[in-house]
């Protein structure tokens, strides 16, 4: 009986160890935004015609593939929203391919806004370099989580949730954004709905927002799709 008791305890310990290892494995995949790397480097071949989930590796690479000055200077904010996003993702820094990280810089004129949007492939953390911002995100239970953030402060936007930043100050503001994806993707809510190509049907938007089709057409005129040649 004693031997049976010892064997039973050993079995239980092994069972717990296996469950623990499984939990770690599951946890790793739950929190990873991108697939893990399988080699030291895989510099993206941005011109390859091969279609994969990500980018294929190019054979020859240099230090230039791992560096960029893209976010070193303020961007122009003279647009309808008074803000501009400058990215440093795999499309600007090919060496980021398979590494699961990227950055962006966002500049805001006084009164400027980065309209409600989502990043379907990444969570985002912003660090305020200059000015102050009113920021927030909305949960799937329609709860608004918001606050004013100041120079030197960070704020996190969970993956996939609608969020925004607004500069209500009298001076320009700027942040650096960090993402846990080499290419987080962005869907701006107003542009997605009212500037899609082909366009979202007027009756769909009218019924969704409880407005008439004339109002829909007026809003669409402000978000006309950019023609690509």
From Swiss-Prot:
Q: Which cysteines bridge via disulfide bonds? A: 42-57
| Co-factor(s) | Mn(2+)
- Tell whether Glycoprotein is among the UniProt keywords: yes
Q: Which Gene3D superfamilies match?
A: Jelly Rolls
Q: Name one GO cellular component term.
A: apoplast
Annotated Mn(2+) binding sites: 117, 119, 124, 163
Q: Which residues are glycosylated?
A: 60
**Span of domain Cupin type-1:** 69-217
Q: What subunit structure does UniProt give?
A: Monomer. In the absence of manganese, it forms tetrameric and pentameric forms which show superoxide dismutase activity.
Which family is annotated?
A: Belongs to the germin family.
List the protein's name: Nectarin-1
